[in-house]
């Protein structure tokens, strides 16, 4: 930022900020509330977490732990919750992917709300609430699935929205839904 200000002052560039939006993220501290440090012994091994929960669950938990601009304390129960959500969504897709379900008014409303809510939350950098929204809509779709099932277009829309946060599961579910190429 300093260089841009300097270059603007000497007339090399005609703008004084290097970007239109600046976002500074917080830090994830150890479960004791202190900065993670090997010397303090409060470091969480990402290798162990990826082995136990998968990299998509780890990525989503880091985004879900709180507002991204604030510091947060690590909590193993949080990654377990995100892992349960991903497993529940995976099961929802697998249980409904071959059903020939027409989207009724309620499913269409849920799909439209999902897309609108997630887009709004994402554009305001409220990534933790994006993931909370995924969980809310997953619960709604599971309820609707018990009645008649969930149509493929709604499942595909959810997978597309989820993929930037859980790309490995997103790709696998995209393929399971019969789509070719990448979900991206």
Model-derived features with residue positions:
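Helix-rich, typically C-terminal accessory recognition domains appended to large enzymatic cores
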Residues: 2-3, 12-16, 48-184
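C-terminal, charged and often intrinsically disordered regions of DNA end-processing helicases
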Residues: 39-47, 51
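Short alpha-helical segments and helix-capping/turn motifs at coil-helix boundaries
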Residues: 4-9, 44
């Amino acid at each position: 930022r300093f260089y841009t200000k300097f270059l603007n002052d000497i007339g090399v560039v005609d703008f004084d900020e290097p970007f239109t939006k600046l976002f500074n993220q917080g830090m994830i501290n150890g479960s004791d509330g202190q900065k993670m440090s090997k010397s303090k012994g409060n470091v969480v091994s990402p290798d162990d977490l990826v082995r136990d929960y998968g990299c998509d669950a780890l990525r989503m938990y880091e985004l879900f732990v709180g507002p991204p601009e604030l510091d947060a304390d690590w909590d193993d129960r949080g990654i377990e919750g995100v892992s349960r959500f991903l497993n529940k969504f995976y099961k929802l897709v697998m249980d409904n992917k071959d059903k020939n379900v027409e989207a009724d008014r309620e499913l269409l409303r849920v799909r439209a709300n999902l897309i609108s809510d997630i887009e709004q939350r994402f554009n305001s950098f409220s990534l933790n609430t994006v993931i909370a929204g995924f969980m809310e809509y997953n619960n709604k779709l599971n309820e609707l699935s018990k009645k008649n099932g969930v149509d493929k277009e709604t499942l595909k829309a959810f997978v597309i929205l989820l993929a930037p946060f859980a790309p490995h599961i997103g790709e696998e579910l995209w393929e399971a839904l019969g789509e070719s190429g990448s979900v991206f």
